[in-house]
Amino acid sequence: MNVDTRRGTPRLFASGGHWAWGPYVARSDDAGTTWDQRSTGLAFPADMGATVASVWNIQPAIASQPGVVYAGTQPAGLFRSEDWGETWAPVDEVNNHPWRQFWGESGGGASTLHTIALHPTDPDCMYISVATGGTYVTRNGGKTWEICSHRAIATNPMQKKMWEEFAVNYPPFANQDFPVPPGVDPEAVNEMHKMRLDTTNPQRLWAQTHVGVFRSDDGGDHWDDVTQGLPSFHGFPIAVSKTGDGAAFVVPLTFEADNFRVVDGQFAVWRTRDAGASWTCLTEGLPGPNDYQSVYREGMDTDDEGGVYVGTTNGAVYASADGDDRRQRLPGTLPPIVSVTAVRY
C-alpha cells in the first residue's frame, strides 16, 4: 500500500492478486471509501512466458515526475505508469535483465520484486530489490541496472554459525556449488528482505537481509554488516527516520525453519541512532513475555514527524507518535497486517 500526495487530493494505492481475478493495483481518491481496481497493461509480454500473479509494491515517483508510478510484481517484474496508475507498461530493462536467470524462488514461491526505493531529488536514480535475486540500482533513468548487493558480506558470528550448520544439511552451500552472476561472491547477500533509502541522506541505504542488517553510506557501492548488538540476524521489516536524525528501526525474528517469530517471546523494536554502531531494545507498550507473533517485510514505517508504526501478524498496530521509547497499541484488531504506510497530510 502507498499514498500519492503529489496532487491536491491524495490518492491511495492498494495492490495484490487474486486466484480468480488476477493481479491488481486499486486506486482511491476519497480516502478509501471507493476504489477503482482496473489495471490495464499490468502483464508481461506474451513472448516472455511468464504471468503476473500479484503486485507486491507500489511506489509513486518524486514530485518532478508527475503522474509516474511504479509497481513491483511476482514473478519479479517492474511496471511503470505515466497516468497516475491508470494504465501500466512493463520496464523491459528490468524484466529482461540478463541476470534474471539467477533469480530463484523465494519462500513465497516465484521470485518477487518487493522493494522500489527512489532518490528524493534525482529522477535518474532508483533501486529495486528482488527476493533471492539481489538489489539493483540505475543511475541513468532505467537504461541500465547494476547489482549493488553483491558487496554485502555477512561478518556477524550468528550468521556464520547458521551458514556452517546449513552447509552440513545442504552440501551445495558448503562447496559454493550453485549458480551466481559472474563476478559475484557466492556468500554475497542475494536476499534483502527489505531495503530502505534515507530520504534525508540519500547516499545512505539500510537493509534487513536474510543474514543480517546492513548499511551503505555510498549508495550501495559498499556495505557494512551492523548486526552486532541485535539478538538475531534475521528479520523482515526495516524502517528509517524521515526527520534527519539518522535513526533506523528493525524487529529481529528467530530463525527456526519457517517459524519466524519475535525473539524469546518478547515483541521488541530495536533502534539505532549511530549508524548501527549500537542498538537499543524498545519494549515499553509491546506485548511479552510469551508473545509469539511476527512482522512482515512491509509491516513497519515512519512518518515525516518522527512517528514509528508497526503492524503484526496478530492484527495489532503499535505506534510511537514522536519516535520515543514507548509504543501504544491503536484501537482494533485486524487480520494479519501485510503492509503499513505512514503519511501525514
Give the ranges of each region predicted by the language model.
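Extracellular glycan-interacting surfaces
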Residues: M1-Y345
